[in-house]
Design a protein with these regions (language model features):
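Aromatic-rich carbohydrate-binding modules that target alpha-glucans
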Residues: 2, 10-55, 64-85, 113
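Extreme N-terminal starter segment of soluble prokaryotic enzymes
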Residues: 1-4, 97-98
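Catalytic cores of glycan-processing enzymes that make or break glycosidic bonds
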Residues: 48, 78-638
């Protein structure tokens, strides 16, 4: 049986990857007889081999370099009979790295304008060097300007999956004249304890337009601009034209655009994106010169009224809304309002839109967080017009026919058990009206409570099978049909946000593709645990104290009834540091809270996002400037 082994390994010059094992075809564990692998692209190696599927095959990868042999440190791998095997080189060989997670908008420096800016990453890099940190992780930094109000502070609702956000441009670097009015506006915005996103955007826009008027004629003739334009024309032109028409129509709702409003000025957006790219790449080069990695964030959704949906409507299901099932942070689930993806259409060109999106990200980032990686297995889909996440269902899915429900022993009555409201036991499938999904958290409904004990037991068994067993292999194959093309599109290191209602096959697929998992101390994945135990932590993961969707460590300890001190916070962080995890990336709030002099009066103010609040203002900002932190704060974590 012909089998292709694929290995994800970012090799160094002079290294040769080989495959060996307990079969004659694999060289009987002798390095001199091991099969050489060929480098394919983007960190992937492969080799074809004929194997006998009747035998138990064990194997390992080895590295040959200048006559030396390095073996994997893991247990022998076992071939499962698949025609295509995807592996990652043993994570024990990975360097232990520690980093900081902070939204770009939260940074504060002596030169910014009410919000963190691209050049501030260089100041942050200096602070990281002082504190021996190696990774900076950001929230998404794509353009979100749909309304020019607080809604645009939400970084996961970008109007373009490619364009950077101009709000992070440093005005002085653009040559904006610094006069008395400029200083006054800058000082007013910087005096605030939070990011006043709408006013920052409005005020900066005024200066950006002035800079464009003064500089565009010369810039458009420069080699630097024309090189940037040629490299990014495919996404830049539709984005700029979309933004220009948004401006003249005062809306991103294309249904309300007038043919008589004109085309606007797309050149303004060429200008902005050129400088966004220039400033960010300058910062990234500085990070790299100091040995730091920059980790980005790949949002699961796009704005339903953004340029991506406008330009590629066939790639999106605009009659559906993406979200998440209920959890400890949102009892009714979440409705993000994003369209879901038409994966069948995307697969026709081998996911070109996704691959290009990642290639553009790779201009700046060394690693990336796959937001809601579960969405690549299945997404929680809510019909358009429905608000509550409780009435959603997974897509793709294997919904139940009426006779299947009855085969479990449940006396199904559509009129009685499907009201179309929250008080329902089943919801109809959006694509097959004669198929049904058990309503998520149906045990909390009055309809369930009114059932007799026998029928409760039946529907509990049906519910358990549907959500935790029925789809395992189906969702595994769903993910494997998409993720390899995406992961292989660049050399960036992929990390998955695998929190929430996790299908059993998710860890298997992530391990197979070499995607780092996410472990959060207060969200154990082992049943019965209160917190994550270090012995449960895999090596190939990011282990942390929390995320932007959670209270800070200090706030969480208070919620638990504890009285945290700087020492108790250090103890938690140090325990995580001494885990097997190859990466630890901590929210900057938790690192700063190891010094009580830096504590906020109310730790709730330090939480970046409250998932249960769709109107959340993303406005958290550091109390101290990065320059002050470099002088005053030194991380004491050992």
């Amino acid at each position: 049986m012909k089998t292709t082994f694929h290995l994800k390994y970012d090799s160094r010059w002079g290294e040769e990857l080989c495959l060996t094992g307990n079969a004659e075809e694999l060289g009987f564990w002798k390095p001199e007889n091991a099969l050489p692998m060929r480098y394919v692209d983007n960190g992937y190696w492969s080799v074809d081999v004929e194997l006998n599927d009747a035998e138990t095959i064990e194997y390992k990868y080895i590295i040959k370099e200048n006559g030396h042999i390095r073996w994997e440190m893991c247990e022998n791998r076992c071939w499962n009979g698949n025609k295509s095997v995807w592996d990652v080189f043993d994570a024990e060989n990975m360097e232990k790295m520690v980093g900081v997670a902070v939204p770009l908008f939260s940074l504060r420096s002596e030169s910014d304008f009410g919000i963190g800016e691209y050049p501030d990453l260089m100041n942050l890099a200096d602070w990281c060097v002082v504190n021996k940190l190696k990774i900076i992780q950001l929230l998404p930094i794509n353009d979100t300007a749909a309304h020019f109000d607080w809604h645009d502070s939400y970084p996961y609702n970008a109007i373009s999956a490619f364009a950077l956000n101009p709000i992070y441009l440093n005005l002085q670097d653009l040559g904006v004249e610094v006069d008395e009015v400029f200083n006054e506006e800058q000082n007013q915005l910087n005096a605030l304890p939070f990011v006043d996103y709408p006013n920052v955007l409005k005020t900066k826009w005024k200066y950006l337009k002035t800079a464009f008027a003064q500089q565009w004629e010369k810039l458009q003739k420069s080699d630097e601009f024309n090189s940037f334009f040629a490299e990014n024309e495919d996404w830049l032109v539709p984005y700029a034209e979309f933004c220009a028409r948004r401006d003249v129509n005062n809306t991103t709702d294309v249904k309300r655009w007038s043919e008589h409003a004109g085309e606007g000025c797309p050149e303004f957006y060429y200008f902005l994106q050129f400088h966004c790219d220039r400033q960010l790449r300058e910062a990234v080069n500085y990070l790299h010169s100091n040995g730091l990695l920059l980790k980005g964030d790949l949002p699961i959704g796009v704005n339903p009224q953004g340029v991506d949906v406008y330009s590629h409507p066939d790639l999106f299901n605009c009659n559906a809304q993406a979200g998440a099932p209920p959890d400890d942070f949102a009892e009714e689930g979440q409705n993000w309002g994003f369209p879901t993806y038409n994966w069948a259409a995307m697969e026709q060109d081998n996911f070109a839109w996704w691959r290009r999106r990642l290639q553009v990200m790779a201009r700046y980032f060394d690693a990336y967080r796959i937001d809601h990686i579960l969405g690549f297995f299945r997404i929680w889909e809510i019909p358009k017009g429905v608000k509550s996440g409780l009435l959603g269902h997974f897509n793709p899915a294997l919904p139940l026919a009426k006779d299947e429900i009855e085969a479990f022993g449940f006396q199904f009555n559509a009129e009685k058990h499907m009201t179309g409201k929250l008080e329902t036991l089943f919801v109809s499938d959006s694509y097959q009206k004669d198929r049904f999904h058990p309503r998520i958290a149906l045990q909390k409904t009055d309809l369930y409570k009114a059932l007799d004990e026998e029928q409760k037991a039946v529907i509990d068994r049906l519910y358990e099978d549907f959500f935790y067993h029925r789809h395992n292999e189906f969702w595994k194959q769903s993910a494997l049909s998409k993720l390899p093309a995406l992961i292989g599109a660049t050399q960036m290191i992929a990390c998955g946000e695998d929190l929430g209602m996790i299908p059993a096959t998710v860890p298997e697929v992530m391990q197979q593709l070499g995607i780092k998992s996410l472990e959060v101390e207060r969200m154990p994945k082992v049943f019965g645990r209160d917190i994550v135990q270090t012995e449960d932590v895999p090596t190939n993961c990011v282990f942390t104290t929390g995320t932007h969707d959670m209270p800070t460590l200090r706030a969480w300890l208070i919620e638990k009834g504890e009285n945290p001190t700087s020492e108790s916070i250090k103890t938690v962080i140090e325990r995580i540091l001494y885990s097997p995890a190859c990466w630890n990336i901590f929210p900057i709030q938790d690192l700063l809270d190891t010094d009580e002099s830096n504590w906020s009066a109310d730790p709730k103010d330090d939480q970046i996002n409250v998932p249960a609040n769709p109107e959340n203002h993303w406005k958290y900002r550091l109390k101290l400037s990065i320059e002050e932190l470099i002088q005053q704060y030194f991380c004491e974590i050992k």
